[in-house]
Amino acid sequence: MNSIVIGSGFGGIAAALRLKAKGHQVKLIEKHPDLGGRARVFKKNGFIFDGGPTVITAPYLINELFELFKKDPKNYIELSPLKIWYQFIFEDKSKFNYSGDEANMVKQIEDISKDDVEGYQKLVSFTKKIFDKGFTELADVPFDKPFVMMQQLPALLKLKSYKSVYSLVSSFIKNEKLRRMLSMHPLLVGGNPFTTTSIYGLILYLEKKWGIHYSMGGTGNIIKGLEKLMLEEGID
C-alpha cells in the first residue's frame, strides 16, 4: 500500500515511520527545504537555535520509533535527563529550582509557605488521576465520533476539566508564587494557564513519571536522527 504524509514535524515523521513499519510505501511531503515543522532550527551569527520545543517529557515515544526497526536510539540521538527542570526567578529575586527531587521540592515549598506543603502533595495526587485518564487511558483513543467523546464527559467533569489549570492549582495552593509556578505547564504547549482546561495539569505528573530530558545538540538533532532513520528505511 502507498501512503503520503504531509508535514514533517514530529507527528508527520512519526506517522511516516509507523506506516513504514506496517509495510507501507511512504512518501513524506514538506514545503520547507528542511524537516522538523515546529522543531526546525534556524541559524544566526554562527549560532543554531531551536525554533520550537526544547523540553522532552516522554522520551520513550521517540525511542519507540527507532525500536520499531530494531535500531538502537543511542546510535542516532542523545537524550540527557536533567537534574533541575526549571528555575523560577520571582519579582523579589528569590529563586526556585523545580525538579524531580520530591524531598527538595517539599523543602523549597516549605521555605515559601509551610501551609502549602500538604496542598502540593494533594495536587500531585490529583494530577496523577488526570494523567491516568487523559494520557494512560485516552492518549491512543481516536475521537472520530461525537459519541466517543460524550462517553468521557462524566469522568472529565469529575476531574474538574471545567476549571482552568490556574484555578485547579489555586484550589490546592494558597501562596501566589507557588500558584503561578505550579500552573505554568500550559505555556509549554502554547496555552494560557488562566484559560486552558485543567486536563493539561496532567503534564505536571507526566514530568514526574519520566523526568525531563534535553536533546544534546538541540531538538533539531532529534529530527536529524529521525531523518537518517527514514532514509535508511526507504521513506522518500
Where are these predicted regions, by residue range?
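Helical element adjacent to the flavin cofactor pocket in flavoenzyme catalytic cores
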Residues: L202-D236
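Alpha-helix capping and helix-loop boundary segments enriched in small/acidic/polar residues
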Residues: P53, F194, H213-G217
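Rossmann-like flavin
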Residues: E91-T196
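Active-site phosphate/pyrophosphate- and oxyanion-stabilizing loops and adjacent acidic/basic residues
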Residues: N63, S167, K224
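Conserved structured core elements
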Residues: I13, S99, L159, K163, ...
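Active-site-adjacent bridging/hinge elements
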Residues: K31-H32, T197-G201
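N-terminal glycine-rich phosphate/pyrophosphate-binding loop and immediately adjacent elements
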Residues: M1-K129
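Conserved hydrophobic/aromatic pocket- or pore-lining residues that grip, position, or stack substrates
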Residues: N2, V169, L226
